[in-house]
Curated annotation (Swiss-Prot):
It holds the Pfam family Peptidase_C1_2. Homohexamer. Binds to nucleic acids. Binds single-stranded DNA and RNA with higher affinity than double-stranded DNA. This is Cysteine proteinase 1, mitochondrial. Gene3D superfamilies: Cysteine proteinases. The normal physiological role of the enzyme is unknown, but it is not essential for the viability of yeast cells. Has aminopeptidase activity, shortening substrate peptides sequentially by 1 amino acid. Has bleomycin hydrolase activity, which can protect the cell from the toxic effects of bleomycin. Has homocysteine-thiolactonase activity, protecting the cell against homocysteine toxicity. Acts as a repressor in the GAL4 regulatory system, but this does not require either the peptidase or nucleic acid-binding activities. The gene is LAP3. Coiled coil: none annotated. Disulfide bonds: none annotated. The keyword GTP-binding does not apply.
Length: 483
């Protein structure tokens, strides 16, 4: 029977106190410190196991990746025959070097196929550095905007701490690429190439820029807390900060030689050794020669944590103020695979995001989840894809390009894919990799296709205006490619 009147208050206080202590009591019962005596017991047990003895002898004397590589499996999967490929060879092999610009390389490598075909070129690259310059400038400003919009949150909140952790990392998403191209266009790499200590090795530059942005964040948050700080003061501060950011950037990189609407002149020699001259603006070059219509690409992901057929938005992730948000449509793996085949059949390469370098042999250029014989040493992996994402074991880390696949005649699904990476010709086989279907299902997360390549029921998810997206926080693994 519950206590009444006078004793009820005392009872409730006692009950609440018990609830507060209960978790600590339970945790204490479940805690387990290392028992030294068990260490000897475990060691005797393992040393009596001949398989363990063999494994430890090998692993203490040889590199684990070399020792456990299943060469029989490797030979079987290293098949470079593909019955569905894009018709234009993508040359030369690109190299992002010591930078996190994979998304810019994958996206520009996709579009350069159109330029190669349109202008009858043997080799061509779009300027990744041109986009990189403006991405840094825009990201810095985007960061300042996020600091202002989160000023009501405590400095120790997860959001503010996440923002401060890496204000202008090199990474990005395809929608962020589109934001840049819509505003700044594209130019040939001949007009604006990489620099050895900024674009190709960005760590120091990022460090100095990050330090200055954190200083600016404190200034803005302090000003916003003062009652006297009206909107005009904040705007003035931000303009001063934008100027200083641009000054810092100009120390590390040349200012792009042409404005988005300014005409440039580019001379080139085609496959037939004929000389041509093009006069174009960056914005015109993107549409006329790279054939990019920014309104058509859409992103699809496979994230088994969430229902399929639903839109997923990554909150606060972006680079250009007023640009498009990062939004995906979540679908099953079979749908992703079929869309890849359809796009390749339309002679278009596929931008995709994966967890790299999981189960990737960089020497031979093979991506396969059974490439290393971990079960031979008793190391068995049991987590499913959804659990790996939830427990931070798997996330989207790298963007590459699918330029071909081998389709099974019976299932009409790919058996393997031809992947173009951006780590130079010494990675893989001349820069190319083979990715198995099982790898695609387990470690591929995103593909980009044109909306007109989708079935009507999927395309309508993007166009109907009736779909309310699932909103994930900026630190979610599905946004990790932008780190």
């Amino acid at each position: 029977m519950l206590p009444t009147s006078v004793s009820r208050s005392l009872y409730l206080k006692t009950f609440r106190s018990h609830l507060l202590r209960a978790p600590q009591i339970v945790l204490k019962r479940m805690s387990s410190s290392i028992d030294i005596s068990k260490i000897n017991s475990w060691n005797k047990e393992f040393q009596s196991d001949l398989t363990h003895q063999l494994a430890t002898t090998v692993l203490k004397n040889y590199n684990a990746d070399d020792a456990l590589l299943n060469k029989t499996r490797l030979q079987k999967q290293d098949n470079r025959v593909f019955n569905t490929v894009v018709s234009t060879d993508s040359t030369p092999v690109t190299n992002q070097k010591s930078s996190g610009r994979c998304w810019l390389f994958a996206a520009t490598n996709q579009l350069r196929l159109n330029v190669l075909s349109e202008l009858n070129l043997k080799e061509f690259e779009l300027s990744q550095a041109y986009l990189f310059f403006y991405d840094k400038l825009e990201k810095a400003n985007y960061f300042l905007d996020q600091i202002v919009s989160s000023a009501d949150q405590d400095i120790d909140s997860r959001l503010v701490q996440y923002l401060l952790a890496a204000p202008t990392e090199d990474g990005g998403q395809y929608s962020m690429f589109l934001n840049l191209v819509k505003k700044y266009g594209l130019i040939p790499k001949d007009l604006y190439g990489d620099l050895p200590y900024s674009t190709t090795a960005s760590r120091k530059w990022n460090s100095l820029l990050t330090t200055k942005l954190r200083e600016f964040a404190e200034t803005l948050r302090t000003a916003l807390k003062e009652r006297s700080a009206d909107d005009s003061i904040i705007v003035t501060l931000r303009e001063q900060m934008q100027r200083e950011i641009f000054r810092l950037m100009s120390l590390f990189m040349d200012i792009p030689p042409v404005q988005p609407n300014e005409q440039f002149t580019w001379e080139y020699v085609d496959k037939d050794k004929k000389i041509h001259t093009i006069k174009s603006t960056p914005l015109e070059f993107a549409s006329k020669y790279a054939k990019l219509d920014p309104s058509t690409p859409v992103s699809l992901i496979n994230d088994p944590r969430h229902p399929y057929g639903k839109l997923i938005k990554i909150d606060r992730l972006g680079n250009v103020l007023g640009g498009d948000a990062v939004i995906y449509l979540n679908v099953d793996n079979e749908t992703l695979s079929k869309l890849v085949v359809k796009r390749l059949q339309n002679n278009k390469a596929v931008f995709f995001g994966s967890h790299t370098p999981k189960f990737m042999d960089k020497t031979t250029g093979v991506m396969d989840i059974e490439l290393w014989n971990y079960p031979a040493i008793g190391y068995n992996l049991r987590q499913q894809k959804a659990s790996r994402i939830r427990y931070h074991e798997s996330l989207m880390t790298h963007a590459m390009l699918i330029t071909g696949c081998h389709v099974d005649e019976t299932s009409k699904l790919p058996l393997r894919y031809r992947v173009e990476n951006s780590w130079g010709k010494d990675s893989g086989k001349d820069g190319l990799y083979v990715m198995t279907q099982k790898y695609f299902e387990e470690y591929c997360f995103q593909i980009v296709v044109d909306i007109n390549e989708l079935p009507k029921e999927l395309a309508s998810k993007f166009t109907s205006g009736k779909e309310e997206p699932i909103v994930l926080p900026i630190w979610d693994p599905m946004g990790a490619l932008a780190k």
